[in-house]
C-alpha cells in the first residue's frame, strides 16, 4: 500500500489552468481534485493487468492436413513398440511407422493419456529438425488402441545388427561412423536437445554408409527439463549410461559424450561395454559407485585411445563437446598423415643403393604393410619420390574444410569401394608426372636387380620368399577389407529386400492414381458405354440378337467396325468409342479432348501399364507359336526316323494290344 500511495503522490502534478490564472487565490474544487487524482491513477497504470504477449502462431507443419498412409510389412521391433514399413498415399514416399500400444499396458487412463501426450509433444519438437545424420520425424496419427509415429525410412540396418552379423568393425569404419555420429549430435546439441540414449541399436546405416541417429525416445528440450541442479530423470540403457545419469545428480550434454565413447567401444569390440563383466543391475551399481570408464581395447591406435579417454572423463565438465571432438586427430584421420610423413621420409632415402634397402627388408621379415598403403611391391616404386603429405593435403580423405566440413560429404561414399583411401592416394600420386624420369630409373634398377637374383641359383628361394612378403598384404589388411566388403554386401542385400517389400505398396499407389484419373471418371459416367465397348472389342452381336441369326434391319456391323479401342486389351474399362453417329460422335470428341488435356504422372503410368500388358500378350502369343512349331518339327523328325506316330499314339496302341491279348475270345 505504501508503494501504491507513493506512486499516486508522485503522479499528482497540479498545474494552474486558464481559469486559475484569473482566480489565483481560490482553492480548487473537490470535484476537480478528484478528477485529477483519477486521471493520474489511470495514467500510472497501477490497476491495469499485465498484458502477456500473444502465443506464437502455430507451426505451419502442425496446421498441415494429416498424412494419408498405408501400413506394410513388419521390419523391426523397438523399445516402445513395433516398426512397420508404410507409404504416404499422397506423395508415394516410403515411411517407417512406429506403432505404440496405448490401451493394454497401462494401469489407469490418466497414465495412458500422459504417455500419449508426452510422445506427441516429443514428435512436435522433433518435426522441425533436419540434418543428414538425423532421422526425420513426419508426424503422429492416433488410432483406437495405437499411436502411430511416422518417421523417415532408412534402408539398411542398425550398427548393432551389423555387429551381430560381421563382428567388430575395423578402425577405419569406426572412424567414419564416429564422425557422422558427432555431426548429428552436434546438430542436436546446438538446438538444445539431449539424445540421452545413444547406442548401436539407435544408429541406422543405409546401403551407402551414411548413418542416422534414431529413436529419440528419451530426448527433451533442456529448457523444459532443467532445474537448479540439472535434469533429474534417468532414461537410457545402463551399459551406455554416464555415472551422473545413474546417480541422478543432474546431467547435461556431456552425458551424450560419455555414450559416444561407449558406442565406439561397442563398435570396436562387438559387445556392449561392461556386458562381459556385469549384468545390467550390477553394472548400474558398479558405474554409480566407482565412476570408472569401461576398459579400452589395447588393439586401438594411440589417437583412438586418446579419443576414448577424453569422452570417458569422470568429471562431466572436463569432457569435450561434440564440436571439439570433430577436430580430434582420430576423427579427422591425422594419424594417417603422420604415418604418410614417415613413409615419405623412408622413400626419400632411396638415394642409397637399392640392395641395401632390400637387405633391410629381408632383415625384418616380421614387418607388415600398414593400412596407410606402404609400397612394398616393386611395381609401386614408380610413385616413391612423390611427397605423400602434399598429395593427401590436396585431396583430404575425410572431405574436411576450414569451416568445419560439409555434413553432406560424409554420405557421398563410393558405391564400388566402401573405403577408397588407397585408390585415391594412388590416383593422386599418379597425376604427379614431373618426376617420372627419376622414377623410371628406379624401376629399371629394380628390374636389373631382379635379373641379378635370377642369375644366382642359390637365391631363388630367398627371392620368392621376399616377393611373397612384399606382394601380399598383411593379415590385418585382408581381414579389414573382407569385413568392409561384407558390410557393404549386407547393406546392399538389405536394400534389395526392402525394395521387394515396397513393390506392392507402389503398385497400390499407382492403381489408386489410375482409379481417380479424369479418364476413368469419364468412363464411369455411363454403364452402357462400357458394355458397348466390351462388345465392340470382342466383336459380339447385341444382347437382343442370337449369334446364329442375321441382322433384322440396318447394318449393325457398321457400328461394330467403327468401334476402336484406344488402349490395349489389358487396359481394363478405360476404352473410348468412336461410333459414326452424330450426337455420340460429338460427345465422344468432347471426352477425348478432356482426356487429352490430362498430363502428368497418371498418363505416363497408364501408358506404361498398357505397354506392359501389350508386351505380355505378344510374348504369350509368340510362346504359343513357338511351342506349336517345335511340336511340328518333333513330329516330322520322328516320322523321318521311322518311329511312326507320336509317343501318345504309341501308348494308346500299346494299350489296345494288351487288351486284345488279355481277351483272346473276342
From Swiss-Prot:
Q: What is its EC number?
A: 2.7.11.25
Residue ranges, compositional bias (Basic and acidic residues):
452-464, 647-660
Q: State the superkingdom.
A: Eukaryota
* Ligand binding (ATP): 75-83, 98
Which tissues show it? Expressed in roots, inflorescence stems, flower buds and flowers. Low amount in rosette and cauline leaves.
Principal EC category: transferase
Q: Which residues form a coiled coil?
A: 101-131, 620-643
Q: Name one GO biological process term.
A: response to oxidative stress
Cross-link Glycyl lysine isopeptide (Lys-Gly) (interchain with G-Cter in ubiquitin) per UniProt, renumbered positions: 109, 111
> Which InterPro entries did the record assign?
Kinase-like_dom_sf, MAP_kinase_kinase_kinase, Prot_kinase_dom, Protein_kinase_ATP_BS, Ser/Thr_kinase_AS
Domain named Protein kinase is located at 69-331
For molecular function, the Gene Ontology terms on record are: ATP binding; MAP kinase kinase kinase activity; protein serine kinase activity; protein serine/threonine kinase activity
Q: Where is this region: Disordered?
A: 452-481, 536-592, 635-666
- Name the catalysed reactions: L-seryl-[protein] + ATP = O-phospho-L-seryl-[protein] + ADP + H(+); L-threonyl-[protein] + ATP = O-phospho-L-threonyl-[protein] + ADP + H(+)
Q: What is the effect of changing residue 98 to M?
A: Loss of kinase activity
Per the Swiss-Prot or TrEMBL record, the active site comprises 197 (proton acceptor)
Which keywords label this protein? ATP-binding, Coiled coil, Isopeptide bond, Kinase, Nucleotide-binding, Serine/threonine-protein kinase, Transferase, Ubl conjugation
The extra comment attached to this record reads: The protein kinase activity of isoform 1S is higher than that of isoform 1L.
Under PANTHER family, the record lists: MAP KINASE KINASE KINASE SSK2-RELATED-RELATED, MAPKK KINASE
The record's family statement is: Belongs to the protein kinase superfamily. STE Ser/Thr protein kinase family. MAP kinase kinase kinase subfamily.
Q: Which purpose does this protein serve, as stated in its record?
A: May be involved in an oxidative stress-mediated signaling cascade that phosphorylates downstream MAP kinases MPK3 and MPK6. May suppress auxin signaling that promotes cell cycle. Functionally redundant to ANP2 and ANP3 in the positive regulation of cytokinesis.
Tell me what this protein is called: Mitogen-activated protein kinase kinase kinase ANP1
What is the species of this protein? Arabidopsis thaliana
Amino acid at each position: 500500500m505504501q508503494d501504491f500511495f507513493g506512486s499516486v503522490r508522485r503522479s499528482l502534478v497540479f498545474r494552474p489552468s486558464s481559469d486559475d490564472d484569473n482566480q489565483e487565490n481560490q482553492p480548487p474544487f473537490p470535484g476537480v481534485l478528484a478528477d485529477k487524482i483519477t486521471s493520474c491513477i489511470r495514467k500510472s497504470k497501477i490497476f491495469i493487468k499485465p498484458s502477456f504477449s500473444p502465443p506464437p502462431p502455430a507451426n505451419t507443419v502442425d496446421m498441415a492436413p494429416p498424412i494419408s498412409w498405408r501400413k506394410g510389412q513388419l521390419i523391426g521391433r523397438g523399445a516402445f513398440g513395433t516398426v512397420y514399413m508404410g507409404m504416404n498415399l499422397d506423395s508415394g514416399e516410403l515411411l517407417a511407422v512406429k506403432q505404440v500400444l496405448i490401451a493394454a499396458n497401462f494401469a489407469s487412463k490418466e497414465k495412458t493419456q500422459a504417455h500419449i501426450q508426452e510422445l506427441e509433444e516429443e514428435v512436435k519438437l522433433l518435426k522441425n529438425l533436419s540434418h543428414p545424420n538425423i532421422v526425420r520425424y513426419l508426424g503422429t496419427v492416433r488410432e483406437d488402441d495405437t499411436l502411430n509415429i511416422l518417421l523417415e525410412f532408412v534402408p539398411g540396418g542398425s550398427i548393432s545388427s551389423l555387429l551381430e552379423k560381421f563382428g567388430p568393425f575395423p578402425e577405419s569404419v569406426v572412424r567414419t561412423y564416429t564422425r557422422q555420429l558427432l555431426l548429428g549430435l552436434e546438430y542436436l546439441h546446438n538446438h538444445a536437445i539431449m539424445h540421452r540414449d545413444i547406442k548401436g541399436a539407435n544408429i541406422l546405416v543405409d546401403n551407402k554408409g551414411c548413418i542416422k541417429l534414431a529413436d529419440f525416445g528419451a530426448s527433451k528440450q533442456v529448457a523444459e527439463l532443467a532445474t537448479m541442479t540439472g535434469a533429474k530423470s534417468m532414461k537410457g540403457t545402463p551399459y551406455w549410461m554416464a555415472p551422473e545419469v545413474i546417480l541422478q545428480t543432474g546431467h547435461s550434454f556431456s552425458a551424450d559424450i560419455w555414450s559416444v565413447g561407449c558406442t565406439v567401444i561397442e563398435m570396436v569390440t562387438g559387445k556392449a561395454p561392461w556386458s562381459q563383466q556385469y549384468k545390467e543391475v550390477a553394472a548400474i551399481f558398479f558405474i554409480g559407485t566407482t565412476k570408472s570408464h569401461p576398459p579400452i581395447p589395447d588393439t586401438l591406435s594411440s589417437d583412438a585411445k586418446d579419443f576414448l579417454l577424453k569422452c570417458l572423463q569422470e568429471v562431466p565438465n572436463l569432457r569435450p563437446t561434440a564440436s571439439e571432438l570433430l577436430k580430434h586427430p582420430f576423427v579427422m584421420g591425422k594419424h594417417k598423415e603422420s604415418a604418410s610423413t614417415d613413409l615419405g621420409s623412408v622413400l626419400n632415402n632411396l638415394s642409397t643403393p637399392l640392395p641395401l634397402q632390400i637387405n633391410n627388408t629381408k632383415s625384418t621379415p616380421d614387418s607388415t604393410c600398414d593400412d596407410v598403403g606402404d609400397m612394398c611391391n616393386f611395381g609401386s616404386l614408380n610413385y616413391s619420390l612423390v611427397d605423400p603429405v602434399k598429395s593427401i593435403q590436396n585431396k583430404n580423405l575425410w572431405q574436411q574444410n576450414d569451416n568445419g566440413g560439409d555434413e553432406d560429404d560424409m554420405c557421398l561414399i563410393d558405391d564400388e569401394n566402401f573405403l577408397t583411401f588407397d585408390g585415391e592416394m594412388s590416383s593422386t600420386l599418379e597425376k604427379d608426372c614431373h618426376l617420372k624420369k627419376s622414377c623410371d630409373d628406379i624401376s629399371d634398377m629394380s628390374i636389373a636387380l631382379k635379373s641379378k637374383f635370377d642369375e644366382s641359383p642359390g637365391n631363388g628361394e630367398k627371392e620368392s620368399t621376399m616377393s611373397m612378403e612384399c606382394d601380399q598384404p598383411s593379415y590385418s589388411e585382408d581381414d579389414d577389407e573382407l569385413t568392409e566388403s561384407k558390410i557393404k554386401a549386407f547393406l546392399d542385400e538389405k536394400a534389395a529386400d526392402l525394395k521387394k517389400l515396397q513393390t506392392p505398396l507402389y503398385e497400390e499407389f499407382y492403381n489408386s492414381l489410375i482409379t481417380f484419373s479424369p479418364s476413368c471418371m469419364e468412363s464411369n459416367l455411363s454403364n452402357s458405354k462400357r458394355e458397348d465397348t466390351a462388345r465392340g472389342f470382342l466383336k459380339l452381336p447385341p444382347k437382343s440378337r442370337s449369334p446364329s441369326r442375321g441382322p433384322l434391319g440396318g447394318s449393325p456391323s457398321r457400328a461394330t467396325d467403327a468401334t476402336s479401342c484406344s488402349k490395349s486389351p489389358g487396359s481394363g474399362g478405360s476404352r473410348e468409342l468412336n461410333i459414326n453417329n452424330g450426337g455420340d460422335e460429338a460427345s465422344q470428341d468432347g471426352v477425348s479432348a478432356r482426356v487429352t488435356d490430362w498430363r502428368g504422372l497418371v498418363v505416363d503410368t497408364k501408358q506404361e501399364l498398357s505397354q506392359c500388358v501389350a508386351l505380355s500378350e505378344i510374348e504369350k502369343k509368340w510362346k504359343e507359336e513357338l511351342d506349336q512349331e517345335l511340336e511340328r518339327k518333333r513330329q516330322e523328325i520322328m516320322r523321318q526316323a521311322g518311329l511312326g506316330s507320336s509317343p501318345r499314339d504309341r501308348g494308346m496302341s500299346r494299350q489296345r494290344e494288351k487288351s486284345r491279348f488279355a481277351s483272346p475270345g473276342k
